[in-house]
């Protein structure tokens, strides 16, 4: 069954301008632990553009029936990592998104990769943020085991890393409490309304975005079988339809006979052997990703199984299940339990482009390196 959300090829003048904006890396330059700053307009514009791109399925990003004019953006929540037993600021900024009652409903993450601005929208960590009083100052700290939400009084574990991954970080217990107090946070208050110009100007009759409602399948906590969760989600969607939960990640791992990390070729080839109706093509690298992924989603009603590389090293599989022709894509991440889907940014030109997305759990950027798709 095909359940896809599409929108006609329409785009506003302001949206085109927003997408075309470039952001200087200096826009992110702040002194360590500085939090009381204005939201830079180019950053605001990029986040606004990312929100506009997910409007056709906003319910998956915590926005539900909210009108975008009701939303506001808060000061960024600073993030840190523990490296060599020291607290070090991360070039990764989380902007909470608030509804009209000043409740956190979603969150934007933003960073730069090779001079390109990367924005992701997700509901990851939102449930924990909603439990924090507005006057509490919060920050996010990544150690060797996972991310933590820090306030003046509490430390909440947000997620766990995959097996055998520590992202080169030390354990938070190695840092004394006085140093952790330097991770100055911000209060959870909406400070800048989101006021995009939603007037649109038709450019044609073709569709400009496609989203497949693939089932959410999680990998077991602490495991490295993200690939199995992606196969389960894809097979469930193709064989049984949206929302189906016939196969789990562990079911697929048992069928493959592996409970360890695998390469993309083995994942795709074995899936084809086990499920004769799949017959996916494994791309040996990352070439021609833009037209191939677009075609697989829009023409073949087939999610793409993508192998991404962390900026800190190591790989992770996610299902590419949506794409907007003007620079965003959407994934099902089996590692993040707090979100159904997450958006990423497409940069570059031509047939081979950069598909980059921020890992809220890993505090790192993921970039597509291999993929399996329906030809």
Describe the role of every protein-language-model region.
Residues 117-142:
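Primarily single-stranded nucleic-acid-binding OB-fold modules
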Residues 13-22:
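Bacterial N-terminal signal peptides
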Residues 3-14:
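Bacterial N-terminal signal peptides that target proteins for export
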Residues 21-35:
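Sec-dependent signal peptide cleavage junction
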Residues 132-134, 153-261, 312, 343-344:
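Active-site-adjacent structural segments surrounding the nucleophilic cysteine of cysteine proteases
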Residues 91-99, 139-141, 146-151:
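Short beta-strand elements that form the blades of beta-propeller/WD-repeat-like
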Residues 33-105, 113-125, 249-375:
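Conserved active-site-adjacent core of cysteine acyl-enzyme catalytic domains
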């Amino acid at each position: 069954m095909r359940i896809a959300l599409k929108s006609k090829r329409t785009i506003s003048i302001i949206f085109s301008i927003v997408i075309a904006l470039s952001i200087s890396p200096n826009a992110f330059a702040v002194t360590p632990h500085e939090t009381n700053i204005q939201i830079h307009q180019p950053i605001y514009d990029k986040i606004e553009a990312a929100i506009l791109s997910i409007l056709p399925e906003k319910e998956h990003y915590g926005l539900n029936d909210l009108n975008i004019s009701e939303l506001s953006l808060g000061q960024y929540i600073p993030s840190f990592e523990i490296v060599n037993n020291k607290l070090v600021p991360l070039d990764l900024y989380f902007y909470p998104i608030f509804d009209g009652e000043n409740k956190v409903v979603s969150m934007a993450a933003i960073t730069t990769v090779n001079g390109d601005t990367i924005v992701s929208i997700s509901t990851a960590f939102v449930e924990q943020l909603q439990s924090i009083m507005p006057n509490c100052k919060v920050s996010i700290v990544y150690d060797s085991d996972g991310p933590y939400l820090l306030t003046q009084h509490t430390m909440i574990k947000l997620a766990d890393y995959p097996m055998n991954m520590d992202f080169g970080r030390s354990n938070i217990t190695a840092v004394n409490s006085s140093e952790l107090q330097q991770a100055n946070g911000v209060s959870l208050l909406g400070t800048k309304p989101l006021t995009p110009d939603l007037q649109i100007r038709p450019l044609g009759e073709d569709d400009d975005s496609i989203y497949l409602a693939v089932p959410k399948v999680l990998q077991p906590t602490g495991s490295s079988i993200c690939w199995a969760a992606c196969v389960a989600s894809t097979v469930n969607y193709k064989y049984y339809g949206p929302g189906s939960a016939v196969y789990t990640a562990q079911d697929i791992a048992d069928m493959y006979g592996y409970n360890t990390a695998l390469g993309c070729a083995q994942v795709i080839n074995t899936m084809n052997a086990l499920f004769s109706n799949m017959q996916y093509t494994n791309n040996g690298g990352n070439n021609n990703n833009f037209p191939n992924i677009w075609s697989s989603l829009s023409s073949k009603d087939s999610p793409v199984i993508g192998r991404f590389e962390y900026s800190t090293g190591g790989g992770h599989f996610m299902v590419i299940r949506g794409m907007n022709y003007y620079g965003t894509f959407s994934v099902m991440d089996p590692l993040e339990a707090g979100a159904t889907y997450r958006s990423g940014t497409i940069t570059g030109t031509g047939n081979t482009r950069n598909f980059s997305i921020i890992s809220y759990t890993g505090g790192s950027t993921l970039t597509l390196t291999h993929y399996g798709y329906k030809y």
